[in-house]
Amino acid sequence: IFTDQFTGVDRQYGTLNGYSTLSTTYESFWEDIYQRGISQIQITKAKAIEGGNTVAEGQALILEGYHFAEAALVFGDIPFSEVNNPEFSSPSYEGQRAVLTGAIAMITDGIAKAGSTSAENNVLETSSTWAQIGNSLKARYYLALGDMTNANSSAVAANFTSAANDWNITHSTANYGENLFWQFEVEQRADYLKMENSYMAQLLNSTDASYKGNAKTVETARYNYYVAANGLSLNTSTGGFAAQTASFPVISFVEVQLIIAETATSNSAKLAALNSVRAHNASKFNSTYDAYVEADFQTGGIANDGHTVADAMKMEILLEKFCSVIGLPTYQDVLRTDNFIGVPIKSSNTTMIPQRFIYPSSEEASNANFPGYVDQFVATPIHN
């Protein structure tokens, strides 16, 4: 909603669409990260160490690093090294950059211990090893830190060559096993969350002034993948983004390739990565995504709307990611680039989208080291 990939329409989602949030808004997210995520992972890690299971320890380290990093990206400073240590009943909040660096170190350690093992299990489907998953996550976090060199080298090391490498959460027709967007739209809160008038829908709609298509790009099929036939709702039909059994990637081939495209130092390398995504799109959507050449980004080119060549390529890469990667990675891109792609501001009371999530009230009530209320429009340290 904040990035305007989707639109909040009804009840509390209409309120969220105007950026009106409270500390209670984020209670469940914090609980999922810490109580249901990190605490369980740390128990697994401890048991793996006790049992001498180095591979399981490595898997736990990668997952632990992932959870801490994702929390730090949206909340800023968070409890980290003292979490679940009985010596610290109120874990201290540690700096966002330090937490991200520590999370990357955890993932690196996990790769060393579990790297060659398949990352597929009964929840996640992939052809990737844990080393590939770990390196792809490191690429995401280095990019958020603005470390383009390490973001690029980690993304290249991930060696994601096709969508088979996607780390997909699988879904089924079983009760509570369905795609979460499908559950929300079909079973729980129909049309609270829509595509209606969202920036992403406008970019993909060939009749809209913001349409990102051109002589080499036809986005109609992708628009129909996201948007229901009524032109308003999420597409929950078979084959749609929010279909009942549609999988959802934790990290994907497309995200990794677009990290390479953004961070590569040569235009040829940028184009190679971007065009690999376009070839993927052509197959996935059975539509036209012809390969770009550098001339397309020069003055007067079909992919240049008055920018320098470098900025025209950056715009195309970031818009492609915006229309391909749903959720928090794209949110970080908007923050990191100072809204380079021009996501509309949906509230008349501000000139920016929310810069962070608000610490939950449960932390204020239970942690003596709670740092105090920080407004959602205060940038986190890495984006300040």
Regions found by a protein language model. Name each.
Residues 12, 18, 199-200, 228-230:
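Terminal low-complexity, poorly structured segments
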Residues 1-16:
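N-terminal leader/linker segments that initiate helical-solenoid repeat arrays
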Residues 3-4, 20-186, 216-384:
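Acidic/polar-rich alpha-helix caps and helix-coil junctions
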Residues 183-225:
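C-terminal amphipathic alpha-helical segment
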